[in-house]
Amino acid sequence: NITKNLKFGENLMVTHSVQDMMDTQGSNGVISSALVFDPSIPVYTEDGGYSGSGELGTDMRNPVSIIDRTDKKRTRDRIFGNVYAEWEIIKGLTAKTDFGYDWSQWQEKEYTPVIPEAGRPNSVAELTQQDWQSTRWINTTTLKYDGKWGRHKLMALGGWSFENYSMNFTNMRGSNFASDDESQRFMDCAGTINWILTGRKEWALMSAFTRFDYSYADRYLFSVNFRADGSSKFSKNNRWGYFPSVSGAWRI
């Protein structure tokens, strides 16, 4: 009965995350601004606006205004899972194949409103948006033998794997928004599209591998490994790399 020695398994993970972000690094971040901003200048003006540095060209912003005005979010969706099948052909000899899939889509948006106060003014509202989508799949198939005869033990493993990764991305910036209202903070509402950058990255990897482990009385150990990797990242004239290794040990 072949089904008696068959095993199947799977796992699946689906996630959705939204991260509110804040620029804390660099000379224009909220931490640097809090350290260098003149403490004698009030946070707000008499009419309820934000106080500036009081001096044009200082490239300095009110740290409270940075916190209140920052609208930077990162949204990510991910589907990750794998399925496998394992078959014990005869006692000690097992075949296994595993297929994994990982899909991700994420977006990062940062909206900068009009900043009128002196220090680091911004005369027009801007929206910077980055979108990525990636797909990765991998398949690994192995044949493994475990045997024992008296004080002798042997493990032999052979297999191959295939892996592929691709990512598409679009980066863009828009400006001249009619309103700072949150309902208008989308690229379709921009009066001007300043730039758009699109691209694609892709690579593939194919591998074959084998391993032999031998031990006598669990004291004398010997191992031989060999692996061959063919990658699209390697040069066209040298797509394959070969990696042999031999090791031995004696347990005292």
Task: Please provide the spans of the model-predicted regions.
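Surface-exposed loop/interface segments of Gram-negative outer-membrane beta-barrel transport/assembly proteins
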Residues: 2-80, 96-206, 233-235, 252
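Residue-level signature of outer-membrane beta-barrel architecture
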Residues: 4, 85-87, 145-147, 214-216, ...
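Extended, hydrophobic alpha-helical segments in both membrane/secreted and soluble proteins
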Residues: 97, 139, 207-212, 216, ...
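Glycine-rich, phosphate-binding/catalytic loops in enzymes
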Residues: 114-115, 240-242
